[in-house]
């Protein structure tokens, strides 16, 4: 009976240790986010609100990760006149000027045709796991599924292009 109790205690301790240990996915995400921080990203978990999609009564909210790059200093006049925008990957009626499969959350009909063409070129070049793109006077953001490091570098290039082009 004593051996049974000792075996039960040992098995329960091993089970508790295994339960607390991070999974392969957790280790991958920790390494990816450390690399993102090294590259200058701010990584934030937040709820992304989608526009109301075609055939759906209510807009959905998704918990996702935003990878952000700060714009740096821009002058006050440019900051005050900035046209913030956010697009998401979904089928919606608010899609004027965007590629198929993308819709506006903020900024529809506010940007020039030239800026829309630049945005569409960026959207076409993004990895499939990116579900949204955002631009404010403070930062540019990509919301994505954290698939692999190569995609993160591709996203960084796209966000740097957005900063350079003042999108």
Regions found by a protein language model. Name each.
Residues 1-39:
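N-terminal signal-anchor transmembrane alpha helix of single-pass membrane proteins
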Residues 3, 7, 53, 60, ...:
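Short alpha-helix boundary/capping motifs
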Residues 21-23, 44-48, 111-113, 119-122:
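A short linear-motif detector with a strong N-terminal bias
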Residues 27-32, 52-55, 120-121, 127-130:
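Intrinsically disordered, low-complexity boundary segments flanking structured domains
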Residues 41-60:
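Short extracytoplasmic
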Residues 59-158:
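Structured extramembrane domains adjacent to transmembrane segments
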Residues 166-167:
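Extended, compositionally biased alpha-helical segments that mediate assembly or anchoring
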């Amino acid at each position: 009976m004593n051996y049974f109790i000792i075996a039960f205690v040992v098995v329960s301790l091993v089970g508790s240790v295994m339960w607390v240990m991070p999974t392969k996915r957790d280790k991958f995400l920790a390494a990816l986010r450390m690399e993102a921080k090294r590259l200058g990203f701010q990584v934030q978990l937040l709820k992304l609100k989608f526009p109301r999609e075609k055939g759906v009564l209510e807009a959905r909210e998704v918990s996702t990760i935003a990878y952000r790059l700060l714009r740096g200093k821009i002058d006050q006049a440019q900051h005050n006149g900035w046209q913030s925008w956010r697009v998401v990957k979904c089928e919606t009626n608010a899609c004027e000027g965007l590629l198929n499969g993308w819709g506006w959350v903020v900024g529809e009909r506010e940007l020039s045709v030239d800026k829309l063409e630049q945005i569409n070129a960026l959207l076409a070049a993004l990895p499939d796991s990116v579900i949204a793109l955002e631009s404010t006077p403070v930062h540019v953001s990509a919301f994505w599924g954290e698939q692999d490091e190569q995609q993160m570098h591709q996203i960084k290039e796209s966000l740097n292009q957005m900063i350079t082009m003042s999108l």
